Amino acid sequence: MYRIVATASALIAAARAQQVCSLNTETKPALTWSKCTSSGCSDVKGSVVIDANWRWTHQTSGSTNCYTGNKWDTSICTDGKTCAEKCCLDGADYSGTYGITSSGNQLSLGFVTNGPYSKNIGSRTYLMENENTYQMFQLLGNEFTFDVDVSGIGCGLNGAPHFVSMDEDGGKAKYSGNKAGAKYGTGYCDAQCPRDVKFINGVANSEGWKPSDSDVNAGVGNLGTCCPEMDIWEANSISTAFTPHPCTKLTQHSCTGDSCGGTYSSDRYGGTCDADGCDFNAYRQGNKTFYGPGSNFNIDTTKKMTVVTQFHKGSNGRLSEITRLYVQNGKVIANSESKIAGNPGSSLTSDFCSKQKSVFGDIDDFSKKGGWNGMSDALSAPMVLVMSLWHDHHSNMLWLDSTYPTDSTKVGSQRGSCATTSGKPSDLERDVPNSKVSFSNIKFGPIGSTYKSDGTTPNPPASSSTTGSSTPTNPPAGSVDQWGQCGGQNYSGPTTCKSPFTCKKINDFYSQCQ
């Protein structure tokens, strides 16, 4: 992933500070999600908070901006520490300013929102456990499931639920200069070690700040903020990918200048994190009819779909495989098989990642930054759920949905059917401002607990459930209908398919009646 996220603009410029002010009321959108066990799922009442980078930042003594457009006010922010002391984050109008709405278990993110004081571009949000802490997820041995509607986001846009190893309180306890914490969306980090984050480790990133040439709201400072990242879903209606990114350090940590590596530095591989990751993109793996708009694709992106991502443990208790399933129109659909010679498979494994780097001729920074073992450690630890919608000032999202590099003819360079001239941020803001993405019906629990083999939702248990051991939900006794599960490791249900269907092995963990 090559993430540079768009931010808000104009009179109330988005910026991240560490103090708190209350000129605007902060009312977070409620969002219900489900925690599952083998006996069913129960609702959890949560909420979402917008990242502090989008918020109005002004002097604690009044309403004078500390950051306007893509520049700091150097008369206030003479250095990073002083800036954090003098500037505050304020409350957010989620729907009116940022185009963020929720209803029950659905969260919708709008692309361009013309608010009362500003024009906002995209957003980044986090799931909250309570008013002051993020909801934490330990993915290893479990599965994460959600419904998504990508019909409203095309070439150049990315609706992206992903997990990162942020601090539960947004760094408030760790860094004395951070008085805002998770309540105001502080503490972001990812495997790009982003340097556009305006406050890092409780100080302003104002020193060495260079305003962007193309983004009127953003820039790059001396500091970056790094941590492992699991991209569950980076997607639009044309392409999708899921990608683990390990780091040599398991928790949030800062970096300086080009030693950060990633998108924001001249030495992409000079940091502590794997900026490229090991991705599974069906189009890049040679299947150009698996995912896309229309009934001729296995997954029709004009319709809502359920996305299931499973993090399997091996016999040694470590990460062995990351698998993907889809549910659409009541059918469970196995992930696409790679058609690339020398790089077979339909899931991510250590072997798949090694072969992919070799066959595609990519730099294997994945292995250098911890590889499969490093990712196992990250997925064993608590991570924060991020849900965002963004466009890309660095490479126009071509790495996701087009040919990238644009002049390349080598295997692996084709990632989607979008034109190499597509995805320019200014074009998107002008031509498709009403684009939006919706995420709903989020479920988390042991493998097999968040969906049924017939595509239906598990029944709720009699009482509240908590995350337990990895035990699949057993389907009813008898023979299995078409598209139902009929085998796999730890599966104890029926293995006979109804006539005329037969049980076909998809991978070690899943067989399906076809």
UniProtKB/Swiss-Prot annotation:
InterPro entries: CBD_sf, Cellulose-bd_dom_fun, ConA-like_dom_sf, Glyco_hydro_7, Glyco_hydro_7_sf
CBM1 domain mapped to chain residues: 478-514
Reaction catalyzed: Hydrolysis of (1->4)-beta-D-glucosidic linkages in cellulose and cellotetraose, releasing cellobiose from the non-reducing ends of the chains
Annotated family: Belongs to the glycosyl hydrolase 7 (cellulase C) family.
Keywords: Carbohydrate metabolism, Cellulose degradation, Disulfide bond, Glycoprotein, Glycosidase, Hydrolase, Polysaccharide degradation, Signal
PANTHER family, alphabetized: 1,4-BETA-D-GLUCAN CELLOBIOHYDROLASE B, GLYCOSIDE HYDROLASE FAMILY 7 PROTEIN
Residue span of region Linker: 440-482
Protein's organism: Fusarium oxysporum (Fusarium vascular wilt)
One GO MF term: cellulose binding
Protein name: Putative exoglucanase type C
Signal peptide: 1-17
Primary enzyme class: hydrolase
One GO CC term, this protein: extracellular region
Any one of the GO BP annotations: cellulose catabolic process
Disulfide bonds listed in the record: 486-503, 497-513
SUPFAM superfamilies assigned: Cellulose-binding domain (SSF57180), Concanavalin A-like lectins/glucanases (SSF49899)
